Amino acid sequence: VQTCALPISKTLLSNPRVLIMDNPFIGLDAKTRDLLHTLLGELTKVTHLQVILILSKSDDIPAFITHVIPVEDRVCGKKMTLQEYLAVRKPIPERMLSEEKEARILNLPYGGDLYHTEHVVDLNKVSIRYGERTILKDLDWTVKCGEKWALSGENGSGKSTLLSLVCADNPQSYACDITLFGRKRGSGESIWEIKKHIGYVSPEMHRAYLKNLPAIDIVASGLHDSVGLYKRPRPEQMAACEWWMDIFGIANLKDRNFLQLSSGEQRLVLLARAFVKDPELLILDEPLHGLDLYNRRLVKDVIETFCRRKDKTMIMVTHYQEELPACITNSLFLKRN
């Protein structure tokens, strides 16, 4: 919330005539989205401020918007009123993943380097503090093999911190009672022994991934959990990278430099990276972040299909309930301390 509110406040203090915002509602919980909707709506009523919103999710269009210009395949359509746009907006197909691709995912062979424990994650009375602020307090949480969890909560409630513990990225985990894949943290395992079982994507990873490599190399970096590609994959591994890029509909982007892609295309590349090693545990933090409605449907289909396979476990964070796949079996809601 703070990273969103501060630039907005600074901008409004300069008394602008035009306010341009690129996907301002992404990453905000429902309460904060409503507050921002209300704030912008009131500003348009009491000032001469002209608001221009760039939105990848048309469901986020606020009621105070008067006109819409749709953009498709890098081409601007004609200007129309909001009511006209809503009347002609194309319905999203109930399914975007083809039956052929669905069968390919379901028939993927299982690797030989699997863990063999009933519990994937065990947290016992875990507390995390940063300075004077307590982020998590006495949290007990068990994720069993094959479960699919929805992790939710207000902004600042500790969701990202919790995921960093599961991903072995938080140094405070060594002082906590945490067991991952049957191995207690601090018992001699390396973070790479943990990460090899995990496929992960998040907005933070997206913002930090500034490597201007070919898209297929970004996907391949997921094989060894590196930021960048420092070990040339074997031919069969590169074939797996191309396979997953095809599943996500981005095979044509494999030789394009990552930083030259649109934000939505980059997100699809990072999703392919999360799936490329066929992980036992998927950790998806706002996986549909920044995608248009068609690709949101496609990614949701891929997630649901992947999770139908035996012993696949998932933890997914989203601020939009409608984004949760039908395979969700459990939920955890975090409250701000």
Locate the predicted segments by residue:
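Conserved ABC ATPase "signature" region
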Residues: V1, A220, P235-L253
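Conserved ABC ATPase signature
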Residues: V1, K231-P233, N257-L261, E265
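Short, small-residue-biased leader/transition segments that mark boundaries at the very start
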Residues: T3-L6
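Hydrophobic anchor residue at the start of the ABC signature
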Residues: I8, L271
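Conserved beta-strand-loop-alpha-helix hinge in the C-terminal portion
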Residues: D73-R104, P325-A326, L334-N337
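Conserved structural motif at the start of ABC-family nucleotide-binding domains
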Residues: V121, I135-D138, K254
